Amino acid sequence: MAPAADGGVWYTAQRTGRLGWLDPESGRVREIPLGAGSSPHGVIVGPDDAAWVTDSGLNAILRVDPDDDVVTRYPLPAEAAGANLNTAAFDRNGVLWFTGQAGWYGRVDPASGQVDAFRAPRGTGPYGITATPDGDIYFASLAGSYLGQVDIGSGEVTVLEPPTAGAGVRRAWSDSKGRIWVAEWNAGQVGVYDPSDGSWREWRLPGDSPQPYAVYVDELDVVWLTEFTADAIVRFDPLTATFRSFAPPSVPSAVRQLLGRPGEVWGAESAADRLVVVRYAAAD
């Protein structure tokens, strides 16, 4: 799911091949069919205010116009068949980058329609992806247990190893300073990589055998995660190194993605087919 430019919230309905839009004020929903065989995974809002969808069923990136619901399809090259598309982010040039869990990452240039796919280091695993405020791109490899720094010109990747071996870097998000926060699924930790000096720090989440899945950093540089063992949304304050947990309304909830806008963090409860929001005091 992803907060939309018009105040609504986009979400993917993976089992029915649709993109949905929710009006949080009225509860009104509209759903847009994406085509036969569609299985949408992630959705983000692009610089054009359109919804951009990673569709593993169609093995394509989709653009959905927010005004007329027209769907434009950008198929992956034949060599990247079965890429198992996951997540996307836009770089500073307006180019969309995507991950495919079957061992792929790539880009779509909306201006030309060109689609490129690259084999990822260590094969299977590319999962979450993020852009920094400067438009640099990093992706997380769950199976590969690394953070990948993408050269947006050449498409080449530099592998960045977290201090904990086999950490299982699942999702990633940039803060306002360009530091990359990661959810370490195997290690039960949240980590941060600072490109300015190449340093890492890690903190273990509270509870027994924590499994952090999604990560999002709000406009205050507070870090939000989802934790599957406790079935909770977790707030981490880097300034005090303290955690606070919130129980979603649904049990089980299994929140697999977090995104937000000032004052709100939105999550998709995959086990309940619901969206959840945590509201907080936003920056002035």
Predicted regions span which residues?
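A short loop-to-beta-strand structural motif that recurs across blades of beta-propeller domains
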Residues: 18-20, 59-63, 103-107, 146-149, ...
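Beta-strand-rich domains and repeat architectures in extracellular enzymes and scaffolds
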Residues: 1-17
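Short loop/turn segments that connect beta-strands within beta-propeller blades
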Residues: 23-27, 65-69, 109-113, 151-155, ...
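Beta-rich, blade/repeat-based domains predominating
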Residues: 1-6, 35-48, 79-93, 99, ...
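Solenoidal tandem-repeat scaffolds enriched in leucines and small polar residues
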Residues: 83-90, 96-152, 157-160, 167
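A short beta-strand motif characteristic of beta-propeller blades
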Residues: 28-33, 70-77, 114-119, 156-162, ...
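Conserved beta-strand positions in repeat-built beta-propeller and related beta-rich domains
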Residues: 10-15, 51-59, 96-102, 138-143, ...
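Blade-level signature of beta-propeller repeat domains, shared across WD40, Kelch, NHL, RCC1
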Residues: 248-284
